Amino acid sequence: IIDWTDTCNAVEAGIFATIDRARREGIDLLIEGVHIRPDNQLLREWRQSGGIALGVVLHVSDQSKHEAMLKQREEFSHRSSNRYINNIKRIRSIQEEMVDRTKITGWACIDVGSENEAKRIKHYLDLEWNSIN
């Protein structure tokens, strides 16, 4: 996962620049992607400026469900699911690292392979909203 870490480091400056701009302009912001490494600095800066910030890692614990989701995604992408299926070990290693980082950072961790878990996203948003109101 070293190349994943390198890519996270490379995009980090752009992520912080996007956050700074949104704070200056007072606009809402949703940042998502596999190259956003769970990090409390991202959330802390947003909260210090009076905003609501929530870090969430979405994962799929069951590998067969994960593969099925990748195949389903192919309908909406120009990329073949084979590209992802052939790299499933690497993808799951990256996912495992992200899940491990939620334990350090306190980010929410939701298994989207489970319908009940996916419903928890609203719960986490409500908790964050209520913490400042």
Regions found by a protein language model. Name each.
Residues 49-54, 105-107:
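Short glycine-/polar-rich loops that comprise or flank the Walker A/P-loop
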